[in-house]
From Swiss-Prot:
This is Elongation factor G. It comes from the Bacteria. The gene is fusA. Catalyzes the GTP-dependent ribosomal translocation step during translation elongation. During this step, the ribosome changes from the pre-translocational (PRE) to the post-translocational (POST) state as the newly formed A-site-bound peptidyl-tRNA and P-site-bound deacylated tRNA move to the P and E sites, respectively. Catalyzes the coordinated movement of the two tRNA molecules, the mRNA and conformational changes in the ribosome. The keyword Hydrolase does not apply. GO terms for molecular function: GTP binding; GTPase activity; translation elongation factor activity. CDD domains: EF-G, EFG_III, EFG_mtEFG1_IV, EFG_mtEFG_C, EFG_mtEFG_II.
Amino acid sequence: MAREYKIEDYRNFGIMAHIDAGKTTTTERILYYTGKSHKIGEVHDGAATMDWMEQEQERGITITSAATTTFWKGRDGKTRRFNIIDTPGHVDFTIEVERSLRVLDGAIALLDANAGVEPQTETVWRQAEKYHVPRMIFCNKMDKTGADFYRSVEMIKMRLGATAVVMQLPIGAESDFKGVIDLIEMNALVWRDESLGAQWDVVEIPADMKEKAEEYREKLIETVVEIDEAAMEAYLEGTYPDNDKIRELVRRGTIDVKFHPMFCGTAFKNKGVQPLLDAVVDYLPSPIDIPAIKGIDVKTEGEITRKADDNEPLSMLAFKIMNDPFVGSLTFARIYSGKLEKGTSVMNTVKEKRERVGRMLQMHSNSREDIEEAFAGDIVALAGLKETTTGDTLCDPLKPVILERMEFPEPVIQIAIEPKTKGDQEKMGLALNRLAAEDPSFRVKTDEESGQTIIAGMGELHLDIIVDRMRREFKVEASVGAPQVAYRETITRKHEEDYTHKKQSGGTGQFARVKIVFEPNPEGEDFAFESKIVGGAVPKEYIPGVQKGIESVLSSGPLAGFPMLGVKATLIDGAFHDVDSSVLAFEIASRACFREAAKKAGAQLLEPIMKVEVVTPEDYVGDVIGDLNSRRGQIQGQEARGVAVVINAHVPLANMFKYVDNLRSMSQGRAQYTMLFDHYAPVPSNVAQEIQAKYSGQK
């Protein structure tokens, strides 16, 4: 089977946004106009095509990024193939966003025209910057009360530090929003309400907007000619680029992430979606427009690149695992190079295991079609893989490569969970392991002392949904304890410890002496180890034992048994015995050495501090600030946003549980908040004593 669409006609993109910016609705409209959805699914009635998990339909928020393939005929009449990845906008699911950005070539950042740039917009924007993803901006909900396109443009500059190139101006706003002005063609598009947005009329720019349109077209040209010397010189001499040249420059600047073309409309009222789809074709990259993916050659350990080409060796990245009620476990993978046939054996280079591809599926939200072959640039769902988890590389066994791994954040909240009946015990273990394979930001462990099962995640909602999925998908009923904060421990001063481990009981004994300097490690690094041994006081082959010994006790600090952060250990001296010394003896010595030293090096308890943003009507500002202060919060500042006030604060996670209920009652349900993990900070001594007493009693 030959490739049906050329790789340059592919667009792999996602839609990223703050919760409630209308992401699912926009995706729905895209699927509707590209002919895949016959009835528009509304999030309001819980029937959106992309939101296919039950909890998503109930809660009206997108949790799992579903991949969808659809097709669109561009302005030139040529059909392009779109692979769209739906990403969640709720902060507890940033891992899903990070994961999908990793495999996208471009993205549409959605803004709510009323709220502009919101906290989660900043988060996903930063993640997209990290992966250098070209982005367009769609200012959605132009029909909403308080919609302000021009303020949104300003906020992009102020809050994201990004350059938005305005491509369209809105005609009217709020309930008077009728259509848009196209600043390249210099005409107006006005949608016909009766046609469900399928038809529009191209008319002249309204007289009262001509001047504004001229001004913004000038700004558009000024920005885009900067990336091309010849165009810049011609422009300075008074020669303007023609429309095709402008589009070419916008495309180049977008792909190089120099600026971001900005459009507007209202997906819910079906206005502005088709020009956005044309813009995806015109401005977002195909797989061959972006740099070839880099990886590590397993044989030589050198860096290699894999071009987006069917004739290159196969390489693909598994970016999502999902349980499907009909097919079982599905692995979503992006093929970067080569081609894949059903039934082929591939190598998982991270796990060093071979896997056989059983079925290969092309996904449309929650319907699917079997395919025999897939090519570079495709996003496919694979059935039958046993060992593969998120972030693994699958490739040609004869040309092994490891593509860069994704980084996953450490969980900040944990709860104890118990099955309600004996019969649920085994099923619960199975369910939790399945869910952990799907979601790397969710962890499961057993508390050694109490034997309880502990689950950890990115926030209360994240864990609620895990427990909920366990009940629905695996039919396991469980009771959950109160949420626990993921505290950490560190040391605050330098300390040198000399420790000798001796054991003599007939036969070969054990002997190892180590002298280690422990000191705080600069922020950002969990643990660093260095050996300054000269003259063989500790033989080279024993030094890994010293490092391993220290690392083995970092998981349980001296104060309350929490994992330790920010420790640097330098081995400066030691002694060994020709017969009695071994790697194990040095491991035992360094372990005991660190335990002794940790108490004397000013051990300190750390807690996760969250960045909290509250958006509240002015009447409740005093109450909100007072309440945040009572939670040990530090107010970072406040600003007006329309008629609301935005309060920024840093608050310990320990004091934020059930905050949503308090905020609702305090503001009669009118205030909202978002919360992101920001950093770890020392716990005040009075609070630290309570925590130590509580946890030491449990340990």
